Amino acid sequence: MLNPITKKFQLGKHTVTLETGAIARQASAAVMASMDDTCVLVSVVGKKEAKPGQDFFPLTVNYQERAYAAGKIPGSFFKREGRPSEEETLIARLIDRPIRPLFPEGFTNEVQVIITVVSVNPEIAPDIISLIGTSAALAISGLPFSGPVGAARVGYTDGQYILNPLQSELPTSQLDLVVSGTDSAVLMVESEADVLSEEVMLGAVVYGHEQMQVAVSAIKEFKAEVNTPSWDWVAPVKNAELLAKIAELSEAQVNEAYQITEKAVRYEKIKEIRSSVLEALLAENADVDVQEAKDLFHDLEKTVVRGRITDGNPRIDGRDPESIRALDVMTGVLPRTHGSAVFTRGETQALVTATLGTQRDAQRLDTLMGDKTDPFMLHYNFPPYCVGETGFVGSPKRREIGHGRLAKRGMLAVMPSLEEFPYAVRVVSEITESNGSSSMASVCGTSLALMDAGVPIKASVAGIAMGLVKEGEKFVVLSDILGDEDHLGDMDFKVAGTTGGITALQMDIKIEGITQEIMQIALNQAKAARTHILSVMDEAIGGHRDDISEFAPRIHTMKVSQDKIRDIIGKGGATIRQLTEETGTTIEIEDDGTVKIAATSGEQAEDAINRIKALTAEIEVGTLYTGKVVRIVDFGAFVNVLPGKDGLVHISQISEERVNNVSEVLTEGQEVKVKVLEVDRQGRVRLSIKEAMEKPAAEATPAAE
């Protein structure tokens, strides 16, 4: 007999239901979570024993959408779901980021969270309820998880914040922000914005955190009701004696090493110091646990770097907390691409290209929330050579997909509409060097490459990554963090925007206790850094090029009557196929009669435009045309006056003199001048050669080829 435990609560305009005990009972914990009609099944399984020698926390979050949730059958050949889509990967990362820091240090047992979307209301995206459901499942699992966390989406319209806006409300919202955190702290923010001020963005984070508290409280009550026994896991005690010995042997050397500005040289020096420490420890005691010693040496590195920063000493590369690394900007670096740029900030570098295409090149997405067409694509590649390593090269990893989407979020607010710029645009950011903040270098490089390609973006966009080191009440906010400062610090806070405001904000916090004051300082510091970077970028290229690349397709737009669309397409698409082949263009026709012609030369475009005009032209009564005889019959001849439009010259209208046999006067293929006498209601055209001959001075309109 199933005895489910259920908890219901109101989150804004939506009813949230959490239920356990009925489905997936062999998992460590399972929760069916629903927000109105959008339902997800969340399962958590944790292994009771860690693998021997494992020195990291193997947490896996799998988010999977099922087509049946939206009443669909998958469109693939196999008619079943395949590898995760980009959207599924991004939501898996969104869930992973706030829960990972809530597991204790030293916990290395394998944990897998699987979120399956089983029902979806197209108005309610599954990401927020997936995060809430994951938090609830972890809370009742007995795992050492210091949650629960809540989650909320925040919109901003007409100066008002909106809690969990519907999908139909988002297009008119100036903000799409997801925030997650505990009852006392914000842990994760992911957002895109329409150039909003720092105050509005911070207000949205605070508002979302306040509103999600109802979810945090409900999950705590749910946990108390389920009352799962906690695991008897005890955090491993650090060997203080061994740590002291390592510090005695190497603290001064580590301190010196972290003043070497070049990353590769610094890493080599640290490696040497670590090897000599291990050698000394083993010489003194052959039974020393080498892995434990390596972990403690890493702890010493962390203590040294953080201590230097909080004590007011220069950072690893000699900068003060607010300084930006040296910048170098180049545009138009690749001869045949439509737009290109190299953006270098210290030891982080991005080679970014922009490619223009027609609407046929836009990405078509078949998602649970409906079919979409995306004319702007941004792809981020992080090859192993950019950090001086060898490694596997293949399809993009989760991190690359996430960084690409963040850079795209930063650019969306400044992209022109399709009416202003009817092109599909693909940007690719190749990270050629990396020492922190490569996603923000991609934002800067994308802005430069788009301007180089002649894309009329509304403003230049720059991105900056901020960090934080907090020890007790002392804290230091760092601008433009290095990879080591990201790894050893307490916060990764990325801000992209224009001189007018913020377009994207991403925040990941590893500790509790980040106050509103700290976030405000970080935002203000980021604004100053962003303004500086934008000034350097504007020196290199102050605005978009006046014209697109000679190698890019040129799109010409014209309008035809909707009832003429079939004339351009022809039977089975024959006419449009012939048009594209003979003119060397790409032609797209929309339902409203808009015709877009993409050509690499003006001559090709003009040829296609003239042919389309001829195909869609109306035959006018009283007008003279030069046409070709296409068929001879006993009672007259059919003459083609416009493409696809023939008219009849009756035998009585061929000549002033009596004609007994049409073939004696006319032959097929013969060019003749005709005058339009009548176009009847059925579209039948009556022509006259005789009438045309009466006015030899009048110039005939030539028939289009």
UniProtKB/Swiss-Prot annotation:
S1 motif domain location: 622-690
Summary of the function given for this chain in its UniProt record: Involved in mRNA degradation. Catalyzes the phosphorolysis of single-stranded polyribonucleotides processively in the 3'- to 5'-direction.
GO biological-process terms attached to the record: mRNA catabolic process; RNA processing
Keyword annotations of the record: Cytoplasm, Magnesium, Metal-binding, Nucleotidyltransferase, RNA-binding, Transferase
Cofactor: Mg(2+)
Positions bound to Mg(2+): 486, 492
Class of the enzyme per the UniProt entry, highest EC level: transferase
Gene3D superfamilies: GHMP Kinase, N-terminal domain (3.30.230.70), K Homology domain, type 1 (3.30.1370.10), Nucleic acid-binding proteins (2.40.50.140)
HAMAP family, alphabetized: PNPase
Domain KH residues, every copy: 553-612
Subunit structure: Component of the RNA degradosome, which is a multiprotein complex involved in RNA processing and mRNA degradation.
SMART domains for the chain: KH, S1
Any one GO molecular function term: magnesium ion binding
Known EC number: 2.7.7.8
Lineage of the species this protein comes from: Bacteria, Pseudomonadati, Pseudomonadota, Gammaproteobacteria, Alteromonadales
A Pfam family matched in the record: RNase_PH_C
Protein name (record): Polyribonucleotide nucleotidyltransferase
